[in-house]
Structures are given as C-alpha cells and as structure tokens.
Amino acid sequence: MGIRDWPAAERPREKLLEQGASALSDAELLAIFLRTGVAGQTAVDLARHLLNDFGGLRALLEADRAAFSRRLGLGPAKFAQLQAVLEMSRRHLAERLRRDPALESPQAVRDYLKARLRHEPHEVFGCLFLDAKHRVLAFEVLFQGTVDGASVYPRQVLKRALAHNAAALILTHNHPSGIAEPSQADFSLTRRLKEALALVDVRVLDHFIVGDGEPLSMAEQGWL
C-alpha cells in the first residue's frame, strides 16, 4: 500500500501541514525530502532503511557525496538538494544572529554554532567577532585539525580581531566525539587567548564547545 492510501493524518506531508514539522519523526521528515520510494518500498520505508543504514540522521547529513550516492534511492541530485537545504539553514541562523547583540540572544549564538560546527568531522576552531555593542561583525573558522584536536595560534586570532576592528569576540570549537566537555588544553588555550587579546583591549566574552547536545558555555559555567 502506497502512502497515498494511508489515512490523511498519517501521511507525512499532511501531518506536517496539520501539526507542524516538530511532530514528525526523522523518517517522516526524510520521506518528505525523498518524495518517492523505490520498488516495494514507500518513501517512509526507504527513509527508515537509510537512517538505519547510515546510523541515524546526523550521520546521513554528514555523509559525503560518494557515501550518499552509493545508497539506493539517493544520488547526486538528492545530495545537492540536501546541501542546499543545510546551507540555507545556516544562513538563516547567521541572519538571525546579526539582528541583535550576541549577548542579548544567547540561544541564537548556540543555534548558529550548532549548525555551523556540529557536523564537522574534524576539530575546528573559530571566532565570532563583535563590535563595541556586541553586534556580530563576522564569523571565521581560523584553524582546522584532526579528530583529536586543532592547533590554535594566538597571534593569528589577534591578527583577525584587529582586521575586523573587533572590540570583543566569542571563541568556539567543536568536539567530534560529541562530548562537549572542556579539556585542560581548552582551559589553557582560553587563558592564553584572553591574555593576548587583552593587550589590545579586545575582550573574550565566552568560549563555546560544540558537541552532540547544547553547546557548552564556559562563561556560564564560571570558567572565564
């Protein structure tokens, strides 16, 4: 039986329109994206199979083009569509972040950093550069490393802060392990960057660590 034969309340698209996207399961959301199934499988069946095959929604979203295209029901066109959707989401969050001072919208900061860094397969370190009113001037990924870490050079962070004429900044990096707990190296790096930036009157307001859950704020924990 095809999805069209299901009761209206159970069809993913109708369910989304009636109850909102948050009411749908991962498989139902993916089924709407897929639009059609394959021989012997509805779009929902195919979505469940793909989620199981990849090991979950996050792994599917992080898959490269080669891994994506090897799966039945997917291909270059679907990969391109998915990348476009992800990029639109990131840009939407970036626009939202630029509307208000960063410290007045901490959830916007968290949402943006999650979208920007959570799916990175290797550790990356970046900065949100802020003006004197804590409005976002720019976000840059400054260093990229391995699964285990990234080398960060205070001189380069200082150089980019001066280039943006930033009055303050928010540090961030991801933990590909998914565990957003700071290491001793993270504490040491934060301290060194605070000291270096203080020499040119640039404040470090926070250091967010991005894992699988909500990004951890070192400032909120009293670690700054």
Curated annotation (Swiss-Prot):
A motif (JAMM motif) lies at residues 173-186. The keyword Heme does not apply. Coiled coil: none annotated. Transmembrane segments: none annotated. GO terms for molecular function: metal ion binding; metallopeptidase activity. Keywords: Hydrolase, Metal-binding, Metalloprotease, Protease, Zinc. One of its GO terms (biological process) is proteolysis. InterPro entries: MPN (IPR037518), RadC_JAB (IPR025657), RuvA_2-like (IPR010994), UPF0758 (IPR001405), UPF0758_CS (IPR020891), UPF0758_N (IPR046778). Zn(2+) binds at H173, H175, D186. Gene3D superfamilies: Cytidine Deaminase, domain 2. The keyword Hydrolase applies. SUPFAM superfamilies: JAB1/MPN domain, RuvA domain 2-like. Belongs to the UPF0758 family. This is UPF0758 protein Avin_02940. It comes from Azotobacter vinelandii (strain DJ / ATCC BAA-1303). The lineage of its organism: Bacteria, Pseudomonadati, Pseudomonadota, Gammaproteobacteria, Pseudomonadales.
